[in-house]
Amino acid sequence: MRPIVDLDHTSGSPTSLLRTFVGLHLRDLGGWIRVAALLDLLATAGVSNSSTRSAVSRLKGKGLLIPDKREAVAGYRLDSAAVSGLERGDRRIFTYRGQRDDEPWCLVSYSLPEVDRSKRVQLRRTLMGLGFGAVTDGLWIAPGHLRAEVEDALVGLDVRDRATIFITQTPLTAEPFAQAAAKWWQLDTLAARHTEFLRRYEHAAPLSENSAPLPENSAPKSSLEPREAFVLWLHCVDEWKAIPYVDPGLPPSALPSDWPGMRSVELFAQLRRTQAEPARAHVREISSAES
């Protein structure tokens, strides 16, 4: 199972921005882009040509991009094997799924011997990347709606026979459940990520204290030119994309009263509605221009 998002990525780095660009735009372009257009677009976002070429080399090595010359024009195409991973990423990044207090939990218990230490490390990273919290070394917990994803992950890592999945109601903890959840998911660290996202991007789509998400069928317009919207949206998604993997959408009973997550989820949705389409239009324009 190919990783969708590198949880250790440094947002804003050339490689991270290129990965974000590929995920946002390359499928919309038919899976291929001219080298010159790619360099131009990433330069607009603040990435030098040399840095973009180095980042492309890394993604070629990971099997994401493939050199492909068309009618004597040098370009890169998306590896077809990467499409399913990008689609899974779309679902996690752009579709927020919050758990209600009356919904079940998914627990995963596993036991791997020392001889399988590398696989054990990989499994832990995978569980973290799915939004599971660590109750103990071999017991992890997440909202019940992640059951199918973790089942696929266990099969993909060839450890399904070493793990047991439990679907249960709220665990009975000795301390208040919210205190236990804060430790299992390291909520202080996660809250800091949400707060930083708000700090960086709330100026682009200010939210009032009582604001509500706009209806899905509404069509708010960006106040930015398409070129500016492209830069804003690329950096915004690059900053945001890892958060939904470590924040599984915990219910109110598991969160502190001042939890910033819902405001940042709302902000990201607002930015998507205002910036995504003009950003897409800019990419299409540059990509279709003559070399």
Language-model features, listed with the residues they occupy:
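Short alpha-helical segments that sit at the start of domains
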Residues: 1-21, 84
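Short acidic, hydrophobic short linear motifs in intrinsically disordered regions
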Residues: 29-41
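Short amphipathic alpha-helical interaction segments
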Residues: 47-58
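Glycine-centered, phosphate/nucleic-acid-interacting loop/turn motifs that mediate DNA/RNA or nucleotide
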Residues: 63
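Short, Lys/Arg-rich nucleic-acid/phosphate-binding segment
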Residues: 69-75
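Short, amphipathic alpha-helical interaction segments positioned at domain boundaries
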Residues: 83-106
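Mid-protein regulatory/catalytic core that forms ligand/cofactor-binding pockets
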Residues: 114-207
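C-terminal regulatory/effector modules of DNA-binding transcriptional regulators
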Residues: 179-291
